[in-house]
Amino acid sequence: MRIQAPAKINLCLFLGPPRRDGRHSLCSLFEPLALADRIEVAESDRDRVICPGVVGENLAARALAALRERGWKRPPLRVEIAKRIPVGAGLGGGSADAAAVLRLAAGEVPDIAEIAAELGADVPSQLVPALALVSGAGEIVERLPAPTSHAVVLLPGGGGLSTRDVFAEADRLGLGRPRAELDAIAARLRQVAGEGASPLDYATELVNDLEPAARSLRPDVGEAMDALRRAGAPFVFLTGSGPTVCGLFADEGAAAATAAQLGRDDAIVCEAGRAPDGT
């Protein structure tokens, strides 16, 4: 069986105060990309997850183990992941892989969403990759109509950026908003994104509260954003906790033209807003 695990971007991310469990409340619009990891699943003599290029435990392996702990009876599986989503780039690659494994047990194991939330903040939204308004600490997912077709240029940067470090820096900088403000923002995002508009139509609403923290830790984030603007991107933003910077475009042709002008080997052009076939 071949399945795909699409990357995601955060079109916006509004940060709330720390919660008692140490996590942060947030309000964000997630959308899938055509960029996806490719996963081969086959029966085997034992469960194993193979992911060349990823050091240490893989979230997909944890997802498979969690399914077994909940009593999933399907025969042992070999899960081999061909990474196409840059690792540690804030594009949700590990979460996408974990969600793809969880989807294998849909209808067979109860409380899949609960397992997803235990695995990580980005996993619940990736169970059904689609434009979604995400709140809580990532576990509350409200799916929205697919947006008008558009495209992105991604500049992943290098070296990764620890989510934990970015949130800690955000706390140090005092970037969190009151919970009541998050609720008002969620209502506004639901209104502007709820009828299938392109994000370019409501770009003024798209803010990432983590951007100052990411730029503080990685000055090259700001440099990448400036480069995209100079190359003509109509709207530029940081996705998630970074370090990936995105330029938003009406179509892939415009995105490709800007990527060519940038002249960077790491630039990725892809369609946004819809998951690829085979997800």
Task: Give residue ranges: language-model regions.
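Phosphate-handling active-site elements
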Residues: 69-80, 104-121, 252-264
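Conserved, helical-rich catalytic subdomain that frames metal- and/or nucleotide-binding sites
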Residues: 47-49, 55, 128, 133-235, ...
